[in-house]
Amino acid sequence: MNYKLIYILLMLSFLFPWGKTGHRATGEVAESYLTDKTRLEIEKILKDPSLAVASTWADEMRSNPNFRKYSAWHYVNMPHNVRYIDSKKSSKGDVVQAIKICKKNLKDSNASIEDKAFHLRFLVHLVGDIHQPLHVGRAEDRGGNDIKVKWFGNDTNLHRVWDTHIIDDFQMSYTELANHLQNNFNAADITLMTEDEWIDESQQLVNMVYSEVKNKDSLGYTYIYENFDLIKLQLFTAGVRLADTLNNIFDE
């Protein structure tokens, strides 16, 4: 038995913010709103131009020691009563700083294709991350990772409930979820904004998430009923905003 392989697979199962299904659904939604010019530019950069596939690359690479320096790019932790603009910024970076770095690189005509591919895959992923409220959580509980709860009787934590459990319990593929989102939400209703405003929006949402759950709570169907619509809206919103961001980069 290959225990090393089993260990790696187990570790990867804990490394997918929004979960693989959520991230890929967001990428799939974004593809519906790209301009033709943006599509062509993405095809020049990525061997596989699928944004759904690109969306999980940044998590898949986290088991690589060379990518550990980018771990802080996936989130930002700050006090619940302090806006990001007024908070102390981490020297290791955070999701807002990382999105800005990616956008700057993709607009740089002197950047290599390899650099652009790296930053494009990261950008697709990070726009999803910033819309998961617990990626804008409190440092003291590591974005809900230290809030232990029961999910249908099984031990887990609040962060994982939002990342994967609620989405995965509906047993939809990412394409089915993306179609469901587009059939239930309208892109024209989404306020686009930028990452500086997205972070404020997610902070407001995470304060609500924290207010509803305590350590050792038991969660199940009622919690799904109360929160899945918000999760779906966040996934769809991330997709629409990702498309707008990419169109602004590649088709100004």
Give the location of each predicted region.
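Bacterial Sec-dependent N-terminal signal peptides
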Residues: 1-21, 25
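N-terminal, motif-rich segments that launch catalysis or mediate targeting to/interaction with membranes
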Residues: 18-124, 133, 138-252
